[in-house]
Structures are given as structure tokens and as C-alpha cells.
Amino acid sequence: MIILKSSQEIEKIREAGKIVAEALMLAGEIIKPGVTTWEINSQIEKVIVSHKAYPSFKNYNGFPAASCISPNCVVVHGIPSKKVILKEGD
């Protein structure tokens, strides 16, 4: 079933997309060897919260972070960690 959106709903979706784009651009700038996935997550969360928004992953079914970061063999929904330090090629 297709649910049609109102112009106000479409504008909210557009605003959310801009916030996500900003967070992803920042993530792309800070991802480098030596950075933890937790640091990346923290910066992503700051961007989202700075727009008075809330990261939808955080606390969803107990997920502890604002983002899912899945380097290498982690297939999906990787939990950011201070122990996961990116290396060259990740």
C-alpha cells in the first residue's frame, strides 16, 4: 500500500535528509586510521542533536548508539566501540 505524504510531511523528510547528509559528510571527513568507531559515532550524534533532532537508532530495541558502524567482517548494525580502532584499509 502506498501512503501519500502531505507537503508538511515531505518537508520534514527533506529536513531529516539534510541532517543525515551533514552527519555522513562529517563522518567521511573524520574516518581515518587511529580513530575509534565510538569517536565517529559521537561526532555523528553531535550533528544530529545540534539540529534538535534525535538519532533514531539510539535506544531502539536496546541499541546503544546513534549510528551503526560496520567495518570489515561486521555485516550490519555494528555497535560503535572505544575498542574498535580503524586501521588502514578499513
Annotate each language-model stretch with its function.
Residues M1-D90:
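Active-site neighborhoods and metal-handling regions in enzymes and metal-associated proteins
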